[in-house]
Regions:
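Non-heme di-metal
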Residues: 1-191
Length: 191
């Protein structure tokens, strides 16, 4: 691959690296807030997504050749809200990445002759699209009050001990391990 030094693609990679790095930290903070509010599953999803953002940042960082590069970019700053607010902000950020930023960066990379970089921007955009979808689904559950209560019987699983319960809502306390409702999720059999 030709040198990235001094190209717009180098600046775009550095911008993406900074954005992914900051998203990782914001999601880590949002995970703490979700746990405080009693949403253990959502906290774990924020943490999992933070780890995925770290991997995206690492992938971008490996393209960089060292030295200094100046970029101008805007990032969300300074506010960790409620879990609902954090989910909404996260979904909007993910939409921006996959919907415009990364496609634009891929186009520039192609124009400058960096096909491998363009493909990475496009591949990471696929993950960001799924992140947005998941955050919007979780937000809908929080807003509707259906994180721990559904309109029909479902199977609930205690994330702490594995206890299974069938009903319209998760138990207030797990009868097996005595952990609070916050540790229950709808059972997902995705193997």
């Amino acid at each position: 691959m030709p040198s990235l030094k001094g190209t717009q693609t180098e600046k775009n990679i550095l911008t993406a690296f900074a954005g992914e790095s900051q998203a990782r930290n914001r999601y880590t903070y949002a995970a703490t807030k979700a746990r405080e509010e009693g949403y253990v599953q959502i906290a774990d999803i924020f943490s999992e997504t933070a780890d995925q953002e770290r991997e995206h940042a690492k992938r971008f960082f490996r393209f960089l050749e060292g030295g200094e590069a100046e970029v101008r970019a805007c990032f969300p700053a300074g506010v960790i809200g409620t879990t609902a607010e954090n989910l909404k902000q996260a979904a909007e950020g993910e939409l921006y990445e996959w919907g415009s930023m990364y496609p634009d960066f891929a186009k520039t990379a192609r124009e400058e002759g960096f096909e491998a970089v363009a493909k990475v921007f496009e591949a990471i955009a696929v993950a960001e699209k799924q992140h947005e979808k998941r955050y919007r689904g979780l937000l809908a559950n929080v807003e509707a009050g259906t994180v721990f209560k559904k309109s029909k019987k479902v199977v609930w699983r205690c994330r702490n001990c594995g206890y299974i319960h069938e009903g319209e809502e998760a138990p207030a306390v797990c009868p097996a391990c005595a952990h609070p409702r916050a540790h229950f999720e709808v059972l997902a059999e995705n193997w």
